[in-house]
Amino acid sequence: FGVPMTPETSAIALVYFVQGVIGLASLAKSFFLKDELHLSPAEAAVVMSISSLPWLVKPLWGFISDTVPLFGYKRKSYLCLMGVVGCVAWSTLSQGVSVVDNRWTASFLFAVGSLSIAFSDVLIDSIVVERARESEDNSTTGSLQSLCWGMVAFGGIASSYFSGELVEEKGSAFVFACTAVFPLLIAGAAFLVKEERKDFSTSSEMVANVVVSGGEREEEKNVSVVEAGKETLSTLWSVVKQKQIWGPALFMCLWQATPSPG
């Protein structure tokens, strides 16, 4: 892909691979809801809709990681946490109807599983953007993007190839158990990410480190979590007010709202 395979680059590739291969459970979810929980198509659709909610509020996860550091890190600690959370959710689902015996429990666990991937997606995207800004070579930025999407595609193809046979031969519980392994790869990848640990705590309050842009100059300052949140919201609002993003935003909205055969 034209990108030096440093430990951090390997971590980025691994997280994107997990985003693709996590689709291994897609078919198993449908079979579990219809064949084991005996839900109607309408009820199953509601459960699947609830499970997709974490993807609809992705900006919220970015806002949280930027303003509320965890154990001195904004990226690594959340990546590790989401990996563990996802593993727990899928492991619980692998216990079958003996534990997950109603649609609400299934909805919650599917949503938590989606949260682990959606949150990780936001975190790894921010890391890719940061590395792209640090690089002076535009070709490296393009190669990094190619690597990311290539790993997602590879993971998706692999999961599509094996998912049907695994569900048929082993059942949905086995597939959920296999899926539980993949979030742990995200947790492991977190330790390969380069991020300097910072002491965000003072004697009286937790503080966050934010970047303040001023023309072509950027500087960092330590502020309270509340002030960091206000700073981030102010920055987001200044971006939303720019008319040049309205067109692309409208296109994305219409694209997502339009029915598709997939």
Label the model's feature ranges.
Residues 67-83:
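Cytoplasmic membrane-interface "Motif A"-like loop-to-helix N-cap segments
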Residues 28, 59-63, 161, 188:
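Residue-level hotspots within transmembrane alpha-helices of multi-pass secondary transporters
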Residues 17, 49-53, 84, 111, ...:
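Transmembrane alpha-helical cores of Major Facilitator Superfamily
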Residues 33-34, 65, 69-70, 162-169:
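Interfacial helix-cap and linker-helix signal at transmembrane-aqueous boundaries
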Residues 1-6, 88, 94-107, 119-122, ...:
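Intracellular loop-helix junctions on the cytosolic face of multi-pass helical membrane proteins
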Residues 1-55, 246-251, 255-262:
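Helix-loop boundary and gating motifs at the non-cytosolic
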